[in-house]
Amino acid sequence: MDYNRNEKVGLVRSRMQGEMKMDENVRIEGKQIVLRPITLEDTPLIVRWRSDPRVYGTLFRQEPITEERHRQWLREMVLSGKCDQFIIVDKAQNRPVGTVFLKEIDREHLRAEYAIFIGEETARGRGIGSEAARLMTDYGFQQLGLNRIYLYVFASNARAIASYRSAGFREEGRLRENYRCKDGNFADVLMMSILRSEWLEKRTAEQCVSGC
């Protein structure tokens, strides 16, 4: 993960001064993708993605959203500092393909919930989700100082589960028939997490493989 030094300093300074909102200038660069902070101008894009049944069918809110509902999310979650949300930009195509975020940021217990969706069909199955998960866990532990990042995923979503595992998330438990789907059936949900100690161990091992 590549943080511009000035951007990193600005982010840390803003938090030290008591500002809890995400620095709008931060950029996180990986091999395939760049993560940039979400803006109000992204609203039509988010609404288009969230209106696709192939997208919202994997989410816990299985319905399209309106622009007003998304703007409400930005006001109540992102601008309030409860959520740090990024747009995933595909470097090869130089276009947005999805969004990723840490929400319910708890600054007392140093934990947050991870979530992601890929909106563009051409970006699926290319490892972009796995890379986004790795970049966001780096961001959460390095920049936010978190101790734990957790997520919820449908037990039937094998592709997402494999992606989370590759980023270091471990299964904590299975919530049986925890979610009632639109068709009336109940679905099991997995809870997964990664701890700071596990992230450090994984990062050390990866650095050793590439540099030892």
For every predicted segment, state its role:
Residues 142-152:
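Conserved GNAT acetyl-CoA-binding A-motif
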Residues 8-21:
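Short, Lys/Arg-enriched N-terminal segments with co-localized hydrophobic residues
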Residues 125-139, 162-166:
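Conserved acetyl-CoA-binding loop-helix of GNAT-fold acetyltransferases
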Residues 65-122, 195-197, 208-211:
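Acetyl-CoA-dependent GNAT
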Residues 150-153, 170-187:
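Conserved catalytic-core motifs of GNAT/GCN5-like acyltransferases
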Residues 164, 169, 192:
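Conserved active-site tyrosine of GNAT-family acetyltransferases
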Residues 94-98, 159, 186:
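Glycine-rich acetyl-CoA-binding "A-motif" of GNAT/NAT acetyltransferases
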Residues 18-71, 198-212:
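A short, well-structured alpha-helix characteristic of acyl/acetyltransferase catalytic modules
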